[in-house]
């Protein structure tokens, strides 16, 4: 007998019929056209190398890529076999060379990786782009190792096509609680005194420790084994794109890049070869039509961990104003 699902469990589950309906919303490789207007805001089901060769050059403002890490894994009938370091580098070079021509001259690219593949990703990226930074984010999930340090970090490499690129610093500040408020002539210095507490909006660094891996009580959660959180990708998208820009994810997975792009009023193109992942992506995109909230992003800023009570106390009026500002 199947154990009933807890009311608090928000993991996306769909019937076979629902799956068919959502899959029908995707477009196949033979439907891909060089006319950008025909493929924008679409999930393309197919091999990313085949699809990338069909996309128009100089058409993408931002690329967010989460390629397979160099591990032998099988998920939902899709297998990636671990390669030697030279072979994985050749694989990386193959898809990056395809993408380089698609990015606009003022465009940016972010590539996710683990510690083993990070040096390869960084090296190959530098052959095609100007590498700007390496972001390391704390990944608090998984068991510890018995004869090694627990793997609790992942990297995201940030690069640009040229020296002219978008970076919206004010859009990605983090609101942190002020432990020792400092005043000048009785006036708060570099911090805000609010009914929720004393806070300072700080500039983001290249180390992110405020990310939560999606889990069963989060509405964005799917059964995808390596799903990235909406908060993680929203930082990237807010920083390196503007409303109306086109964002490409060549390894879409369960759709986080497309979903966040939609919530933040950007356009998206997602490529994914696994049909089940495409189904989850389309379901999440549908939900994004009625719920544009992003966990941990409230009042136009990102909040540090363990600040839910302060976030929740923000009035509905304040949230409505923030949503209006986001649409501008």
What is each model feature region?
Residues 1-280, 320-328:
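Core catalytic lobe of class I
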């Amino acid at each position: 007998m199947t154990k009933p699902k807890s009311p608090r469990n928000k993991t996306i589950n769909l019937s076979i019929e629902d799956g068919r309906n959502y899959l029908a919303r995707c477009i196949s490789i033979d439907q891909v056209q060089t006319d950008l207007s025909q493929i924008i805001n679409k999930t393309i089901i197919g091999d990313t190398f085949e699809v990338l060769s069909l996309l128009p050059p100089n058409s993408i403002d931002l690329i967010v890529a989460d390629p397979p890490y160099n591990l032998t894994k099988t998920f939902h009938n899709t297998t990636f076999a671990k390669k030697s370091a030279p072979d994985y580098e050749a694989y990386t070079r193959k898809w990056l060379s395809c993408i380089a021509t698609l990015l606009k001259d003022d465009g940016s690219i972010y590539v996710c990786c683990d510690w083993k593949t990070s040096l390869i990703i960084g090296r190959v990226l530098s052959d095609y782009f100007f590498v700007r930074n390496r972001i390391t984010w704390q990944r608090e999930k998984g068991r510890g190792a018995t004869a090694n340090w627990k793997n609790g970090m992942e990297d995201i490499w940030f690069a640009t096509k040229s020296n002219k690129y978008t970076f919206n610093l004010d859009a990605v500040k983090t609101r942190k609680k002020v432990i020792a408020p400092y005043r000048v002539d009785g006036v708060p210095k570099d911090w805000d005194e609010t009914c929720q507490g004393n806070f300072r909006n700080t500039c983001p660094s290249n180390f992110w420790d405020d990310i939560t891996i999606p889990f069963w009580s989060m509405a964005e959660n799917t059964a995808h084994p390596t799903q990235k959180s909406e908060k993680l990708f929203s930082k990237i998208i807010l920083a390196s794109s503007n409303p109306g820009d086109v964002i490409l994810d060549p390894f879409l997975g369960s759709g986080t890049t497309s979903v966040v792009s939609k919530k933040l009023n950007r356009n998206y193109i997602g490529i994914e070869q696994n049909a089940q992942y495409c189904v989850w992506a389309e379901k999440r995109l549908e939900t994004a039509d009625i719920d544009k909230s992003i966990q941990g992003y409230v009042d136009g800023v990102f909040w540090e961990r363990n600040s839910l009570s302060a976030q929740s106390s923000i009035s509905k009026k304040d949230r409505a104003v923030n949503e209006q500002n986001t649409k501008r």
